[in-house]
């Protein structure tokens, strides 16, 4: 089935769309066509965005044609499903679906566009009291317990923990003293577990902090560690998730957290002293705690390796429930 994935060029949004496509592919064949949505006049991108959203109020085919005309042409012939994420794609997705009668799946907060404009509108909290608005337990991403298990290898027996490191952002602010304490805690943890840690930094990690981690932990991290500012961008984490005995992730990145959770492994989020995050984000993280998908601790606290059951069964049930709901909504 030919599926159009509309991209706004933001990697996190694109990965969410790909995550939904991967979920559906477990039951049906999908032929993905990825197209980046671009306005005809790039300098007018901001007003186009606002006008397109406004036109989605009581959307008609006439209004939909106006919205479509703002953007460079996209060939939708033979397309049977539209998937898109992010506010910048929502108006176009709604308009194209109305004009072509192709079912659409939209991810992300509505930004003023009603969920009724989408067959399935996936959000982390309820915005509209309509069945189209489906509330997610886990933000969609590229990983699943099965994909991580299939990607694992003999290194899964090395008792290694995985550390996903972010940085400043969404109201989380880390002091250097906190990073230094985390470094000492990782050293203590590796000695306690007689293992090395696998460390993955990200776009959000300050280059100086990445260098500090590399230099201070040079004898304590595995060769599989990935350093974003040293050529490690856009790494596929399936193997690392599959091999990890436990996952620690800084709490500033919802995508890193959702990816970690989706592996089915035990996940602990690490937070700094200084947090001034939007309520929507803190509620999102709290929901993961309430579902017992994560536990959380200060980045300065001692790291623990408690034995316990993984979340693989729970994650698989959540995935099956979401997949069933989507198929019902798009009538496939």
What are these regions (language model features)?
Residues 110, 115-178, 301, 305-306:
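A nucleotide-sugar donor-handling region in carbohydrate enzymes
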Residues 168-200, 205:
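Conserved catalytic-core segment of nucleotide-activated headgroup transferases in glycan assembly
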